[in-house]
Amino acid sequence: MKKTQTWIITCIYLQLLLFNPLVHTQGICRNRVTDDVKDVTKLVANLPKDYMITLKYVPGMDVLPSHCWISEMVEQLSVSLTDLLDKFSNISEGLSNYSIIDKLVKIVDDLVECMEEHSFENVKKSSKSPEPRQFTPEKFFGIFNKSIDAFKDLEIVASTMSECVISSTSSPEKDSRVSVTKPFMLPPVAASSLRNDSSSSNRKASNSIEDSSLQWAAVALPAFFSLVIGFAFGALYWKKKQPNLTRTVENRQINEEDNEISMLQEK
């Protein structure tokens, strides 16, 4: 009985070992993103809305898959956040903003390191270079949040040739620069809209639905077959051991009857 229980436990652990690698193929850099990204809302509310932040924007971010631009975009975000950090002195009145930006810099630097470890192959990059632009805090951290969200589902999926080239027939990108006239302070509630750029999110949603269905199919099917195979082995083992267990019980009953007979004879 103990051997049967041991085999069942072994089968369960085997399924876990087979299933976990399949699950962890999704979001290759996901564990580098900490809860400190939630402080972006607070930071945007603290900065004047007319404050301009320089960022080299990667062309095609709104129309191409994330693996086409995420590596270069996160490097440019690291440069811009580091420059922004240098503009805040590490003193009491500026400590809140300084601390938040410092944590964001560490997150982005970790993501840069992760992307260096997981380089995309067979990807034909666009010949266009990042364009220096001026963004308000809301626009800048909207790009930051979009990049962070891209890491949650980022995979090494470029097994075939993937051209990351902007079509010449596609409409020109909307200029993200914002006029400095008539500045006003950004209420904290408005910062929650950073993640919701309607035009880009709709395109992202349509692409992500198709990608996620394929990803889950790739994960679920091998896991299902591994579970079936594991339980089949367990059933065969149990069936093989069942006659031995039956014979053991019968032998035990015979021995008990023999002992009772011998005790009666002795009396």
Swiss-Prot record:
Residues with Pyrrolidone carboxylic acid modification: Q26
InterPro entries cross-referenced by the UniProt entry: 4_helix_cytokine-like_core, SCF
Signal sequence residues: 1-25
Gene Ontology biological process terms from the UniProt entry: cell adhesion; positive regulation of cell population proliferation
Gene3D superfamilies named in the record: 1.20.1250.10
Disulfide bridges in this chain: C29-C114, C68-C164
TM segment ranges: 216-238
Domain of life: Eukaryota
UniProt-recorded name of the protein: Kit ligand
Gene name of this polypeptide: KITLG
